[in-house]
């Protein structure tokens, strides 16, 4: 039985919502695959993926089926009890990664909060209270809680909230010498994104990530990889650390892991996990049956040779066409990234104008993303159809052509 809802419009946002977002001027109401329809029935191609979340597009049948089945059985019991979907998903993550233990939560910020707390707890338990310093990268992004925004290397997000959490420093990304100079015996963790997402879709260099691993080993520090944006097939591997062959001690995952349903996880080893004894950390909703049922369906679809190989092929399809557009119109100078996390770096003449390109794309019925003011970001579904890629890139080129005419 359908329910009749009161009509709402984009203007209502400004009347009832806290103004910390500035959403587009249209409201999406329906999605299927890599297409989205707004209230007026306009059809858009989605290259944004809900900011790298809708890893299987909109309303994928496997996810709809898993959610519907679980919704008819059990929604929530809290972590006073466990549940079957949680245990099934945890086992699949353990079987597919370096990890031996999993902590579920609801968002990337929560997963990183757990990761950073665990790193400090391990150091405290093993080496004493003086070993608590965390080193992260300039322009990194790890969430919006007070702890995670302090670890993030972007003052525009962390300033203005009173004293920041102490013991956190930042060094330039991909600068191994700077990292060597920063790490000491007081360092409890080095926190890195294998691919900086919000910082401009900047992949880590192999020798940099290998060097970080070596430094952590030499100083009894933990290597924490934030794979909130790069994980769950986005790079063409289940997790980006597999692309580099550099294994972290702790890994955070969110966004794609739930395919659009709020879900996140912290992965680690048994040896480290034991420092989170009962009551040391927790969450009410984390690992709820609905989220984990969807997460299990996500990993079942993604973690196959066909899908992961398809990501690599689709990357090349995007890269070839985007480089051609860049050469023809002179709007961007570099196409970078891994898999289906792709960034176009704007040329000097267009620096600071990513929002203009975002708006021009929307006018051509295309949903894209920014990664700061100087980079256009694409994070589409990993199973996006070739025809949708072609059509979306045609619309993108029309937007660029109109801007530059």
From Swiss-Prot:
Binds 1 pyridoxal phosphate per subunit. This is Acetylornithine aminotransferase 1. GO terms for cellular component: cytoplasm. It comes from the Bacteria. The keyword Amino-acid biosynthesis applies. It comes from Pseudomonas syringae pv. tomato (strain ATCC BAA-871 / DC3000). One of its GO terms (biological process) is L-arginine biosynthetic process. The gene is argD1. Keywords: Amino-acid biosynthesis, Aminotransferase, Arginine biosynthesis, Cytoplasm, Pyridoxal phosphate, Transferase. Its EC number is 2.6.1.11. PANTHER family: AMINOTRANSFERASE CLASS III (PTHR11986), SUCCINYLORNITHINE TRANSAMINASE (PTHR11986:SF113).
């Amino acid at each position: 039985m359908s329910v009749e809802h009161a009509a709402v419009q984009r203007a209502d946002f400004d009347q009832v919502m806290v103004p910390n977002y500035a959403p587009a001027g249209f409201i999406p109401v329906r999605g299927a695959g890599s297409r989205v329809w707004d209230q007026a029935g306009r059809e858009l191609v989605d290259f944004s993926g809900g900011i790298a979340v809708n890893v299987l597009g909109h309303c994928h049948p496997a996810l709809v089926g898993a959610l519907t089945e679980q919704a008819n059985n059990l929604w929530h019991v809290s972590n006073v009890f466990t549940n079957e979907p949680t245990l099934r998903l945890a086992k699949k993550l353990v079987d597919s990664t370096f990890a031996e233990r999993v902590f579920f939560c609801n968002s990337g910020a929560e997963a990183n909060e757990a990761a950073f707390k665990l790193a400090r707890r391990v150091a405290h338990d093993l080496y004493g209270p003086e070993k608590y310093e965390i080193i992260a990268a300039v322009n990194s992004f790890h969430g919006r809680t007070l702890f995670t925004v302090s670890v993030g290397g972007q003052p525009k997000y962390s300033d203005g909230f009173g004293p920041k959490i102490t013991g956190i420093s930042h060094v330039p990304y991909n600068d191994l010498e700077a990292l060597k100079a920063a790490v000491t015996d007081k360092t409890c963790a080095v926190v890195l994104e294998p691919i900086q997402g919000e910082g401009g879709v900047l992949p880590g260099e192999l020798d940099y990530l290998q060097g970080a691993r070596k430094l952590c080993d030499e100083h009894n520090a933990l290597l924490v990889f934030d794979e909130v944006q790069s994980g769950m097939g986005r790079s063409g591997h289940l997790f980006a650390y597999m692309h580099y062959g550099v294994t972290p001690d702790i890994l955070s995952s969110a966004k794609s892991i739930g395919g659009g349903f709020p879900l996140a996880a912290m992965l680690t080893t048994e040896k480290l996990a034991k420092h989170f004894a009962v009551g040391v950390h927790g969450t009410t909703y984390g690992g709820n049956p609905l989220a984990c049922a969807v997460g299990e369906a996500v990993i079942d679809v993604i973690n196959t040779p066909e899908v992961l190989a398809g990501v690599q092929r689709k990357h090349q399809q995007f890269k070839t066409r985007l480089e051609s557009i860049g050469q023809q119109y002179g709007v961007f100078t570099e196409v970078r990234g891994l898999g289906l996390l792709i960034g176009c770096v704007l040329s000097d003449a267009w620096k600071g104008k990513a929002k203009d390109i975002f708006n021009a794309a929307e006018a051509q019925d295309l949903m894209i993303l920014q990664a700061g003011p100087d980079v256009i970001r694409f994070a589409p579904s990993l199973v996006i159809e070739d025809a949708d890629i072609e059509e979306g890139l045609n619309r993108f080129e029309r937007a660029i052509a109109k801007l530059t005419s």
